[in-house]
Regions:
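Bacterial lipoprotein signal-peptidase II cleavage site
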Residues: 20-32
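Hinge/cleft segment of the Venus flytrap/periplasmic-binding protein
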Residues: 44-77, 218, 229, 233, ...
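Extracytoplasmic "Venus flytrap"
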Residues: 56-75, 79-98, 102, 106, ...
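Hydrophobic alpha-helical segments within soluble ligand-binding/sensing domains
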Residues: 60-69, 181-207, 221, 252-253, ...
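Structural motif
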Residues: 64-68, 111-137, 241-262, 276-279
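Short, solvent-exposed amphipathic alpha-helices that sit
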Residues: 91-107, 189-193, 217-237, 251, ...
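Hydrophobic alpha-helical
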Residues: 144-160, 226, 244-304
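Flexible loop/hinge segments that line or gate small-molecule binding clefts
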Residues: 149-188, 206, 300-308, 312-313, ...
Length: 365
């Protein structure tokens, strides 16, 4: 039987495909590469915790007030400390001198201490803004006056960002996260001032009060301390008026004149803050030295001159040099050496200077 050529061709193609399939090498199945052992993640050693700070209200007067030394330890990197103060009256001159001394002592350790004056008033707007600026400029620590309660949230925010904050000279009674305070017991100073006034005027008579700022909590503590003590212990002392002089001597001069004109029988003027020499000058110019007594604070040159003349009966100190010096040193010691102040409120000495003992505290220039 004759085969069709197409069938023969199809058979040949089929046989050829079968031969190729049989001869093809089998493709090995893919094999998975064994997984490499997991490498442990790099872990950064946690920062050691700082020691606990003393209780906010625990008070003491340290033996090394004004002379505290830096710990002899080199920090890991250069550091910056901001000290926020004022220069609106002569009181601040020795405060700044204290800060400059601290800067000199800390310089060998690679620490820069900057004295910064953000304005001429103690307000939260001024000093809160200055604290925010110091945080933005990456200061390692901040020391500030805090006489306005509104400053507290700014301090707490800085501490929350890892920057310790200390206060000096004046602070709010509102609890906050500041590390420590260096300055006077202001309410007690007001009480002491009342006792000095009572001694000067024989425990009775009309007295006027010139405060720095009613809005500054520190000045209010001195004012209320005076008023409360006089009411309690010397009820025959009558406060005839209270004004604020914004820490200015020339304003105190005019206010003292006004008080003496309105009250011819005035026997005392109590100045809680800056500018007492202005009130004393008004008393002297009115010819009433020894009849109208001034009681004040601080040992600035002009004030001491009027103590020496017998116009200011007593002026009460607060160690301004220590207030400017100690915060920067103690902040450094805390950051670098974990040295914690012994108290939360490091109360400065409150020496009382009168004409009788002025030679122990002042030499005329």
């Amino acid at each position: 039987m004759k085969r069709h050529p197409f069938i023969i061709l199809l058979s040949l193609v089929t046989i050829f495909v079968m031969i190729l399939t049989a001869c093809a090498a089998p493709t090995p199945a893919p094999t998975e590469k064994p997984a490499e052992p997991a490498q442990p993640a790099e872990t950064k050693a946690p920062e050691p915790e700082k020691p606990s700070l003393p209780a906010f209200d625990k008070a003491c007067t340290p033996d090394d007030e004004g002379t505290v030394k830096p710990v002899d330890m080199q920090p890991d990197k250069p550091m910056k400390i901001a000290v926020l103060g004022l220069e609106n009256n002569p009181f601040w001159i020795p405060v700044k001198e204290g800060t400059m001394k601290a800067a000199e002592e800390l310089k060998p350790y690679g620490v820069t201490v900057d004295w910064i004056v953000p304005g001429d008033q103690h307000t939260a707007e001024v000093f809160g803004g200055a604290i925010e600026a110091a945080v933005a400029q990456e200061y390692d620590a901040i020391a500030t006056i805090a006489g306005d309660a509104g400053v507290a949230p700014f301090m707490d925010k800085a501490v929350g960002a890892g920057i310790p904050v200390a206060t000096f000279n004046s602070e709010t009674a509102t609890p906050n996260k500041r590390a420590f305070f260096v300055g006077a017991d202001l309410y007690l100073q007001g009480q002491t001032a009342c006792k000095a006034m009572a001694e000067a005027i024989g425990g009775k008579g009309k007295v006027a009060i010139i405060t720095g700022f009613f809005a500054v909590e520190a000045h209010e503590l001195r004012r209320t301390g005076f008023v409360d003590e006089c009411k309690k212990s010397f009820p025959d002392i009558e406060v005839v008026g209270e004004v604020e002089n914004l820490d200015k001597g020339d304003t105190a001069y005019t206010q003292a004149q006004d008080f003496m004109s309105a009250n011819p029988d005035l026997v005392g003027i109590y100045v809680t803050a800056g500018g007492p020499f202005g009130a004393a000058a008004a008393v002297e110019d009115a010819g009433k030295a020894g009849k109208v007594w001034v009681v004040s604070f601080d040992f600035v040159e002009e004030t001491m001159q009027f103590v020496d003349k017998g116009v200011i009966y007593a002026t009460i100190g607060q160690d301004p040099f220590a207030q400017g010096h100690d915060p920067a040193i103690r902040l450094f010691n805390y950051l670098v050496g974990d040295v914690v102040p012994e108290c939360g409120r490091l109360v400065t000495r409150a020496d009382i200077v009168t004409k009788k003992n002025i030679a122990d505290f002042w030499t005329p220039k």
